[in-house]
Amino acid sequence: MDLPGPIHDFLLVFLGSGLILGGLGVVLLTNPIYSAFSLGLVLVCISLFYILSNSHFVAAAQLLIYVGAINVLILFAVMFMNGSEYYKDFNLWTIGNGLTSLVCTSILVSLITTILDTSWYGIIWTTRSNQIIEQDLISNSQQIGIHLATDFFLPFEFISIILLVALIGAIAVARQ
């Protein structure tokens, strides 16, 4: 989106705070329905980030697939579960929770240090979209594939990783 600088900065801060508050809501709220709604807020904020970065197709796919389908499916599954099983044997902190928290925190710290230490300007992309001539013979689906493989490669990979994590989480919940 071509917005003036202060408006763009305000929207970035507003969406970033929405992401942080929604993420905290997903983790800290004890009612799983409220957590699912907080997850919907996070996914909508991510989609709005894509709109701010002129990735309209990725934003539409984010809204349709994640907010429209996966979040509704999570809400549907949570509403069918027995609500009383969430509050039985409620322990505030266990050794497994502490170990999991320690592992996740160490992964987060290592990712942050890796991202900050990487020289992003030194990365040379082998294929750029301005080198690919989009002819009239190329169909729309091929153009979308070209853009996903060049311009929107990182957002596409982030979405696939998020989908993989959601799938692993669904399998873990289903096994219990």
Swiss-Prot record:
Catalyzed reactions per annotation: a plastoquinone + NADH + (n+1) H(+)(in) = a plastoquinol + NAD(+) + n H(+)(out); a plastoquinone + NADPH + (n+1) H(+)(in) = a plastoquinol + NADP(+) + n H(+)(out)
Intracellular or extracellular location(s): Plastid, Chloroplast thylakoid membrane
Keywords: Chloroplast, Membrane, NAD, NADP, Plastid, Plastoquinone, Quinone, Thylakoid, Translocase, Transmembrane, Transmembrane helix, Transport
GO terms under cellular component: chloroplast thylakoid membrane
Topology of the protein relative to the lipid bilayer: Multi-pass membrane protein
One MF annotation (Gene Ontology) recorded for this entry: NADH dehydrogenase (ubiquinone) activity
Protein EC: 7.1.1.-
Transmembrane segments: 10-30, 32-52, 61-81, 92-112, 152-172
InterPro entries in the record: NAD(P)H-Q_Oxidoreduct_6, NADH_UbQ/plastoQ_OxRdtase_su6, Nuo/plastoQ_OxRdtase_6_NuoJ
Top-rank taxon: Eukaryota
Disulfide partners: none
A Pfam family matched in the record: Oxidored_q3
Assembly and interaction partners: NDH is composed of at least 16 different subunits, 5 of which are encoded in the nucleus.
Known role: NDH shuttles electrons from NAD(P)H:plastoquinone, via FMN and iron-sulfur (Fe-S) centers, to quinones in the photosynthetic chain and possibly in a chloroplast respiratory chain. The immediate electron acceptor for the enzyme in this species is believed to be plastoquinone. Couples the redox reaction to proton translocation, and thus conserves the redox energy in a proton gradient.
The protein's name in its UniProt record: NAD(P)H-quinone oxidoreductase subunit 6, chloroplastic
Organism: Gossypium hirsutum (Upland cotton)
